[in-house]
Amino acid sequence: TLMALVVAVLFALVVAACGGTSGGGDGEDSGGDGGGGEDAAVDLPECPVDALENVTAADPVEVTVWHSYVAKTQQALEDLAAQYNDSQDRVVVRVESQGNSYSELQRKYQQAIPSGDLPGIAILEDTQNQSMADSGTVIPLDSCDAADDSFDTEDFLPIALDYYAIDDVVWPVSMNLSTPILYYNRKHFEQAGLDPDNPPTTLAEMRDAAQAIADANIPGIEAPWVQVSNPSFVESWMTGAGVELVNNGNGRDEPATAATIDGNEQLLDLFNYLNDMVDDGLLNPLPDTEGQIDQYTAMATQRSSMAIETTTAATSIEAFLKGQLDTSQLSSDGRINVEGLDLAGLDIDAAPLPGVEEPGRPQVGGGVYYITNTTPPEVQAAAWDFVKFINSTESQVFNNLQGSYMPLLESAVDDPELKATWEDTLSGQWLALGFNQLQTGVDPEAPGITLGPYTEFRDELGTALEDMYFNDGDPADVLGQAQANIDEAITRYQEENF
């Protein structure tokens, strides 16, 4: 129950928020074919890694980290900062929450750009990568890699570098990785005559399972599938099927100049599928509002049997079920309340993301670390030193086990504690599921969209979903309107230099 609620809140942070406006720049460095490396860091901002050499314990450098995490994910970040502070005496890292959603954090970051009053590090949502690169306010990973002989990216997951590369330059200095998976109620599957060990693998099978659950007339179920109208899931379904949503190779061959939504047969088929599911009472769509948790309450109270969310909340879910989670962080409106919930009777499991054609084909998601270039050199160097700590195998293992993010390093999966957790605990098995999707399910040649006005793109795609669900919009019409609005946003981004 609570588990589901927690997942919802954390996932809302991961995928629901695209932030405020995009950053500056002319959009000419969008695109890229993955990778990154020192050869690309020729005309990039410098990373003053040596500026920390003259700093002493008597006058340590302070680095502020902005984030928008909650629950176990927030605690993991705070614990890592404390561990780093205890490990040395020249840098003090201070972790500051800027709200409970990526969009709120992004707005604050954008508002601070004119004054330059930015933190040393900002952990922003993955869709901000192009606009952050264009903003002129951050130092790319490749610059720090080239300047620091003690560091390399050989151990990084290749798909992470591929996804975040723009013209072969990787801008985030660290990546908190997550992917969407299917959460489902095993007891409901059994009651409907379904095999709980063989959950749906495709959207067609999702409909079959939902119909079987509906036909079983299980007491209390209002709709077999509850789902937030989150456009990132649409992106995952389309990316997994090899369908582009903006032109020029999803903006990776060269800067995208238009969306490819209107007249996109595969996307229209998906919208028609979802619309039919709602019309037939098999899917309960929810508005994609900040802090949305109703999908979790539906799962917690067993009013629904299935939901698609990310791996990010796995540890929070488990902690919630065990009564070890401080739920006061998650909601101020009283909607998260464990009293009266049948936690013992809630049997939740997870499976790879059901796809259009095959399972486990998601799009990369999560939060990413950026080092700003508006602070003094010694602060930039101190921020890099902390990031190197975050990028260590030990920290990546800790962040996975405590914060539910996928490890960025391939070496992390060989850690004995991580191995045992992934094999022996419920949350660990879900995390292993997500990691496997990252390794095998994302096409490195087509990992997803890169776009300056990605915020506007996702907002318009989400609006199209909600207009169809809640305003009786015709699928073709809402997609046509989304196309027009996205094209305007792309043109405006190019003309106004952000």
Question: Which role does the model predict for each range below?
Answer:
Residues 166-175, 180, 204-259, 266, ...:
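Extracytoplasmic/periplasmic solute-binding protein
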